[in-house]
């Protein structure tokens, strides 16, 4: 899936929790380099994180924090492009982020995030397609893929398909409610 996207979007919570690389490991040639995009209102991104250590003009961070701080300058020297963004209630304005990505000719965005950012995108009706993976575990951590998951009932899905990929279950579906 990462191979098919122009950009991969995540929140700082995912970066802090998992320290991922967020790269396309398909081994296939790409039309353009995968742009890794992080929403980080307070600029909590560590210069020591794997994603920063592998930054090579492919890491874009939207933040409401000052771009003149020593930490911001250190991240910029490491190859991170910082973009000042509006924040409401401590969260980066997702609609404004997508507009900026569109200005950069980013046409497809893969959202790989935690429940808060997933829930925000869901509530704003910014999701075209859902692809959810479930691992076959009897007991889990009780986390849900979307914050405010009860509101999913107001967003019915259609064309639901499920298939097994290795040991995991992959569910694909499309929102029935038209996007804004």
Kindly give the residue locations of the regions a language model identified.
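Enzymes that bind and transform nitrogen-containing heteroaromatic metabolites
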Residues: 1-180
